[in-house]
């Protein structure tokens, strides 16, 4: 048996490896660390601090939505389910990232109570789309119930449970999933109907529906955010029907909604035939362009959401989803990106009588740039030598964001890049469609990709079965970061809790039970000791 190398020999090997690493690799690693520091500072001090706790409505519940450019509350403060859910989600995630900052956890609980007590329709179920500041339902140009908004409610409730362990939040998320699946899911053609009456009846198009109205169509935006919501819920509630619907949405988006060229069709008839005006005159196309254009921001966002769902579903070697996601980013980069200063344009179109892509709107909204940075880094991880030079594009887009989107004086991001629309310097910072969700999520994901935390929490110990209460109890994982626990029965994941007690379902008998510790980045420990629940 060969002897172990000496300490000097080991040191020489380490030195040789270090000096053998090309300078550009070291420089790239240094750049990543530097940008991660910049992003964390921007995330905490420029984004989260201006919003929280200032946006908490201590008078009427929920969150204030409308803020002026210098972060003063303005307007009537009507409340939309999407905004309220997103703020609840952001506070839940911030509480995991920064457990020593008490107002994030308090803000998440505050948001959950508003969703539960005000936005939930106690008569018919489901969440109202739009209410006034005091919680009275309003039309506001929306359908009474919408799948998009109800999906974000699931998203928020699952995140709040993941952070808090409040089972009433998980139960409401499950109740909402079942309500949405009963009323909005299409059992024939799959997917979900977006528009619903208050009682959950889907609204279909008829002869009176204006031709340029979204009402009654299925759409990509609802679909990708239903996917996202089901993904979030599945991480804490691994239910078979939920898994089936999550898989269904992934394959529907990837294989039907994404076109062969690599962009999303936007609106659809019930059978997923696209709403398409490309055979019409240019004037007709422009009249209906809100229903039929290329949205580069949604394309780069969807590339990420598909990969996230594939990972959550545990699909091994899913090269098909990866390559379609890459195609979507490449298409947006080749056709809808400003190579001179950076930034994804808002809208493009393929006219049949014109070569290539025509840019309809060369403006650059804030959320597309946030999503773009995240997806650039994902593709750089998988394809570091790709001729698109994803990391260089990421750096350019981050520089663009710092220069033309981030308001270093008053906080947060402008709604549109001021290289194209300087008037946005003094326009609203917050409104029902603009909170912290897109850029906060992008910051979290980018920082984790730039400086990956790949260390799993320590294994939880002393797992015990309390037969009198049919519950598991254990000693927590001694980790200095937020840690939750996955529950397994005969090797299959059956649940999650951030607490150190889990009440077992009634059907879990005759099973061997064990747990793992898992952090917010998905790093999971080895299994704990095992216990057996007899029949």
Predicted regions and their residues:
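Glycan-recognition and catalytic cores of secretory/periplasmic carbohydrate-active enzymes
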Residues: 26-468, 487
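Short beta-strand segments within Ig-like beta-sandwich modules, predominantly Fibronectin type-III
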Residues: 492-499
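Pro/Thr/Ser/Gly-rich low-complexity, intrinsically disordered linker/stalk tracts
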Residues: 451-480, 520-535
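A generic structural signal for beta-strand entry/edge sites
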Residues: 189-191, 467-471, 499-503, 510
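Beta-strand-rich modules
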Residues: 504-524
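Solvent-exposed loop/turn segments flanking beta-strands in beta-repeat/beta-sandwich domains
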Residues: 477-490
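Bacterial Sec-dependent N-terminal signal peptides
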Residues: 1-29
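An aromatic-rich alpha-helical recognition segment common to small helix-rich domains
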Residues: 460, 474, 487, 504, ...
């Amino acid at each position: 048996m060969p002897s172990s190398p000496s300490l000097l020999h080991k040191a020489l090997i380490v030195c040789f490896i270090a000096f053998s690493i090309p300078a550009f690799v070291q420089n790239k690693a240094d750049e990543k660390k530097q940008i991660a520091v910049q992003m964390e500072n921007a995330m905490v001090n420029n984004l989260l601090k201006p919003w929280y706790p200032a946006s908490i409505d201590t008078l009427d519940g929920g969150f204030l939505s409308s803020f002026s450019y210098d972060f003063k509350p303005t307007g009537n403060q009507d409340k939309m389910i999407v905004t309220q859910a997103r703020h609840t989600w952001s506070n839940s995630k911030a509480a995991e990232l920064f457990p020593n900052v008490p107002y994030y956890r308090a803000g998440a609980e505050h948001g959950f109570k508003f969703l539960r007590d005000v936005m939930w329709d106690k008569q018919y179920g489901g969440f109202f789309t739009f209410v006034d500041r005091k919680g009275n339902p309003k039309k506001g140009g929306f359908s009474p119930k919408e799948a998009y908004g109800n999906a974000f409610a699931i998203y928020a409730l699952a995140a709040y449970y993941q952070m808090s362990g409040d089972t009433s939040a998980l139960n409401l998320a499950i109740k909402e999933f079942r309500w949405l699946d009963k009323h909005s899911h299409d059992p024939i053609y799959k997917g979900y109907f977006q528009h619903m009456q208050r009682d959950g009846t889907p609204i279909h198009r008829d002869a009176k529906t204006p031709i340029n109205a979204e009402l009654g169509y299925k759409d990509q935006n609802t679909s990708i955010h239903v996917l996202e919501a089901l993904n979030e819920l599945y991480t804490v509630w691994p239910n078979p029907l939920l898994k089936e619907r999550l898989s269904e949405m992934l394959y529907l988006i990837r294989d039907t909604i994404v076109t062969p060229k690599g962009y999303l069709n936007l609106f659809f008839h019930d059978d997923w035939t696209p709403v398409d005006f490309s055979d019409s005159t240019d004037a007709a196309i422009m009249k209906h362009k809100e229903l039929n254009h290329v949205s580069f921001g949604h394309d780069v966002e969807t590339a990420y959401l598909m990969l996230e769902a594939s990972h959550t579903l545990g699909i091994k070697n899913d090269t098909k989803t990866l390559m379609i996601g890459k195609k979507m980013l490449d298409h947006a980069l080749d056709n809808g990106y400003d190579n001179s200063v950076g930034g994804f344009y808002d809208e493009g179109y393929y006219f049949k009588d014109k070569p290539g892509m025509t840019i309809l709107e060369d403006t650059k909204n804030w959320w597309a740039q946030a999503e773009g940075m995240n997806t650039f880094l994902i593709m750089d991880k998988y394809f570091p030598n790709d001729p698109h030079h994803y990391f260089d594009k990421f750096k350019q887009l981050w520089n663009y964001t710092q220069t033309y989107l981030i308001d270093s004086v008053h906080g947060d991001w402008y709604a549109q890049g001021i290289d194209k629309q300087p008037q946005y310097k003094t326009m609203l910072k917050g409104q029902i469609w603009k909170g912290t969700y897109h850029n906060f999520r992008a910051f979290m994901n980018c920082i984790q990709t730039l400086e990956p935390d790949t260390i799993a929490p320590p294994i939880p110990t002393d797992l015990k079965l309390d037969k009198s209460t049919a519950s598991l109890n254990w000693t927590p994982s001694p980790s200095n970061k937020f840690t939750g626990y996955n529950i397994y029965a005969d090797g299959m994941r059956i649940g999650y809790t951030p607490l150190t007690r889990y009440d077992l379902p009634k059907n879990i008998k005759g099973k061997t039970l064990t747990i793992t510790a898992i952090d917010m980045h998905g790093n999971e420990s080895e299994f704990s000791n095992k216990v057996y629940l007899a029949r």
